[in-house]
């Protein structure tokens, strides 16, 4: 499972700073599309520290939430938070591979926030969701769509042209089209066995005071940059990312640098 491994301090930073400033963008969109009649059994794959499970529980009169994540410190935080949810049962466990140990067709809902951008990872995630969700159950994925973080990709392309770094130039071309489109993501869900596919798309922006502010921000350090690096698939990112930092300082010296995030949430119903 290609997710950033979180140490104890990183898990705490994610919960304190990344969830309220960034993951809520995806969680709120997901909650808007969450269908429930009051009772639900939810599996949350890549649950990190357990957001937005408490908000889902607030909508339910009975049921359960099972969360899975590859990072033990994140799971410990999720368990602590889950123990404070009175209305439904919660269970959080560490996992590393698909398929998980959970039983087939055991859940009414399957959710994931900010999954890996790698296509093979998303296909594996959707296949596991299709296995776990019962017929007519709902899957919800909320993720950055095509066009997200394009400002960084453009600056990396500028670096490649300036320093004749052909490998990075090719990587940026791949990265610029790596994130899913509405049409592409719809097809992915349908191929995995889901129907009634609907996608909500909300463009937003993240503001940074400088290149250093961007590079040191927990949102970038823990979620966005590792995802970009994995998409680029280049070994040495230090020099090009230093160029990005300096370019932001130079081009946006008198104004705020805004990074585009196209927040998308896709919903589908498991076909019988």
Where do the protein language model's features map onto the residues?
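C-terminal helical/coil "lid" or tail adjacent to the Rossmann-like core of SAM-dependent
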Residues: 198-253
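A short acidic, Gly/Pro-enriched loop at the edge of an enzyme's catalytic core
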Residues: 98-110
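Class I SAM-dependent methyltransferase Rossmann-like catalytic core
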Residues: 4-22
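Conserved alpha-helix/loop element of class I SAM-dependent methyltransferases that forms part
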Residues: 20-40, 55
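A short SAM/SAH-binding and catalytic strip from SAM-dependent methyltransferases
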Residues: 108-122, 143
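A short glycine-rich, Lys/Arg-flanked "PGG" loop and its adjoining helix->strand segment in the class I
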Residues: 123-138
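Class I SAM-dependent methyltransferase SAM/SAH-binding core
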Residues: 41-100, 124
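Conserved catalytic/acceptor-binding region of the Class I
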Residues: 136-209
């Amino acid at each position: 499972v290609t997710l950033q491994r979180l140490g104890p301090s990183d898990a705490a930073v994610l919960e304190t700073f990344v969830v309220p400033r960034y993951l809520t963008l995806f969680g709120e969109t997901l909650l808007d599309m969450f269908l429930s009649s009051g009772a639900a059994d939810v599996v949350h794959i890549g649950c990190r520290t357990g957001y937005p499970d408490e908000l889902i529980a607030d909508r339910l009169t009975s049921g359960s939430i099972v969360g899975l994540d590859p990072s033990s410190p994140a799971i410990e935080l999720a368990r602590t938070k889950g123990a404070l949810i009175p209305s439904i049962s919660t269970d959080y466990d560490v996992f590393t591979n698909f398929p998980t140990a959970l039983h087939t067709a055991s859940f009414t809902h399957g959710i994931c926030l900010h999954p890996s951008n790698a296509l093979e990872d998303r296909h594996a995630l959707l296949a596991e969701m299709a296995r776990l969700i019962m017929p007519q159950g709902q899957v919800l994925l909320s993720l950055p769509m095509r066009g997200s973080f394009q400002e960084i990709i453009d600056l990396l392309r500028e670096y490649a042209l300036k320093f004749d770094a052909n490998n990075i130039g090719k990587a940026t071309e791949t990265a610029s089209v790596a994130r899913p489109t509405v049409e592409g993501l719809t097809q992915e869900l349908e191929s995995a066995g889901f129907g009634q596919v609907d996608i909500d798309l909300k463009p937003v922006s993240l503001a940074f005071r400088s290149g250093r502010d961007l590079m040191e921000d927990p949102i970038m350090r823990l979620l966005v940059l590792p995802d970009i690096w994995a998409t680029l698939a280049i070994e040495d990112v230090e020099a090009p990312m230093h160029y990005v930092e300096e370019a932001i300082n130079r081009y946006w010296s008198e104004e705020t640098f805004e990074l585009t995030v196209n927040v998308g949430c896709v919903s589908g119903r498991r076909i019988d």
